[in-house]
Design a protein with these regions (language model features):
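Predominantly flavin-linked oxidoreductase catalytic cores and closely associated redox partners
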Residues: 122-264
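Short beta-strand to alpha-helix junction loop
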Residues: 51-52, 99-118, 170, 176
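FAD/FMN-dependent oxidoreductases across multiple families
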Residues: 106, 250-337, 341-367
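C-terminal helical "tail/cap" subdomain of flavin- and related membrane-associated enzymes
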Residues: 339-480
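Helix-loop-beta segment of a Rossmann-like dinucleotide-binding subdomain
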Residues: 89-109, 113, 148-150, 243-247
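N-terminal Rossmann-like FAD-binding beta1-loop-alpha1 element of flavoenzymes
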Residues: 1-30
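N-terminal FAD cofactor-binding segment of flavoenzymes
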Residues: 14-18, 34-87
């Protein structure tokens, strides 16, 4: 295994469960004793918010109840389906058995990773070799196809050969091992699409005796030129994250500076209560992140593997915009799909073909849905800033969005249908094919906002583009 992040640790747990002996090579040093001071330099997005889906929670509860217990001991919390409902929807809420599955994990990425690492160590699931890089893949040949039979590592100037039956790439967005294979003449079939979004995140800590603000849905506001959200984590920590478009100079400049960032947040009704100085205090700087893209990598071309004994998990094989919260969950689920395949056959060709087929059957439709949403998001930004005129289709889509928003707030059945897809228990787009859900949305739209008017108006309240410029001028910060 190369990489001891969420994907690598998940793969170690899964592979050990099917009888494999596992070694993990990790380029970062051992974690700091205190999670608050652990800086995961090899994973720059570790400081960004991570939505940990109900599907991931179910995996932990089903296969690793001891890990889940350790997470709870570390202060990791849970947020139940009913907790996301608006008070109006709660008056109409009739619980269903499956609602328990729609409980999410509230944790910092670093808390989750450190706890998983302790769990792996406590249960002797893998040997972790820290502060070590892989500078070469050992290649042989089997029936005319390159075969990875180990790695050459380097630790503080000292090299070491580690032979292995299989090598698993969990290096994430760095694509480190894919580049090593490419340099050896082994190319993958890669679908790649850039993401035009930048993340700017600041961490906060609740003051003693304070609680998170009451909310409905994911706390935040969505506009065509930006998205902002607050996400609870463990031990009273939470993030506020502003997502802006890469070529939006004003908002990018505003997001980089704590003074303008917080002034902007104070003018957004869904976010202002979270950063109230009486409720919470900032615990660090603003962290920017722009290494975001969509990627689908395959080593099987026209039914034939291009490489044997080599598999990729997590962001090394499938990537999407982190706002959809797929990263950690898909990494863990994909690792277990791989372990199932490895346990079922020793044929290296069948292993890769079956693994990639399982990935496609499990994740491909949602990946395509997210990519379509991403392209729509980019178009809407161009319309919002006046670069592209809105068509009749664009206006109709915006109208549908408003109708859906009202139903998500007021109707537990609609929220359940959408939330099930968001948490990985149905396809993300499954609700769009359900007549009963559309009937509820249409019925709600015919009633009109009514008692939702105040909330809808709040969610639409924001600084105008001219007010954004005024915020920058007030703090003598100029976009360029």
């Amino acid at each position: 295994m190369v990489g001891a992040g969420i994907a690598g640790l998940s793969a170690a747990m899964a592979m050990r469960a099917v009888g494999c002996r596992v070694a993990i090579v990790e380029r970062d040093p051992e974690p700091a004793p205190d999670v608050d001071h652990w800086r995961r330099s090899g994973v720059p997005h570790a400081v960004q918010p991570h939505f940990l889906m109900g599907r991931l929670r179910s995996l932990f509860l089903d296969r690793y109840p001891g890990l889940f217990a350790m997470l709870r001991e570390e202060g990791v919390d849970e947020i139940a389906f009913a907790d996301y409902l608006h008070p109006l929807a709660r008056t109409r809420y009739v619980p269903k058995r499956e609602d328990a599955l729609l409980t999410v994990i509230a944790s910092r990425r670093t808390t989750l990773e450190r706890t998983m690492r302790r769990f792996v160590h406590r249960n002797s699931m893998a040997t972790i070799i820290p502060h070590t890089t892989v500078n070469k893949l050992l290649l042989a040949e089997r029936e005319g196809t390159p075969y990875v039979c180990g790695v050459e590592t380097r630790t503080e100037g000292s090299s070491r050969i580690i032979p292995s039956e299989i090598v698993i790439d969990a290096t994430g967005r760095t694509d480190a091992l894919a580049r090593l294979l490419a340099s050896a003449g082994v190319e993958s079939n890669t679908e790649h699409f850039p993401c035009n979004i930048l993340y700017f995140t600041q961490w906060f800590r609740l003051r003693p005796g304070k609680t998170f603000p009451s909310t409905s849905g994911l706390p935040g506001q969505i506009f065509d030129d930006f998205v902002i959200g607050a996400l609870p984590a463990d031990n009273g920590r939470f993030t506020v994250t502003l997502q802006v478009h890469r070529d939006d100079t004003e908002l990018t400049t505003l997001a980089k500076h704590p003074e303008t960032f917080r002034e902007f947040c104070r003018r957004l009704p869904a976010i202002a209560p979270w950063i109230d100085p009486d409720r919470a205090e900032a615990t660090g700087p603003i962290y920017g992140f722009g290494m975001m893209d969509y990627l689908w990598r395959s080593w099987v071309v026209k039914g034939e593997p291009r490489i044997l004994g080599f598999f990729a998990v997590g962001d090394s094989v499938i990537r999407s915009n982190p706002r959809f919260g797929r990263g950690c969950t898909w990494a863990a689920l994909g690792a277990h799909l791989l372990a199932d395949v490895v346990a079922a056959t020793r044929d290296p060709r069948l292993r890769l073909v079956r693994y990639e087929k399982k990935l496609r059957n499990t994740f491909r439709k949602d990946w395509m849905t997210m990519l379509a949403i991403e392209r729509t998001t980019q178009r809407r930004f161009q319309i919002a800033v006046g670069h592209t005129p809105a068509t009749l289709r664009d206006r109709f889509a915006s109208l549908l969005d408003r109708c859906l928003l009202e139903s998500l707030i007021a109707d537990p059945a609609v929220f359940r249908a959408v939330w099930s897809g968001y948490n990985g228990f149905a396809r993300m787009s499954s609700w769009t094919t359900r007549f009963d859900i559309w009937a509820r949305i249409i019925k709600r739209s015919m009633v009109g906002p009514g008692e939702l008017s105040n909330l809808i108006n709040q969610l639409r309240t924001r600084p105008s583009r001219s007010e954004i410029g005024e915020i920058l001028d007030r703090f003598a910060i100029f976009s360029s």
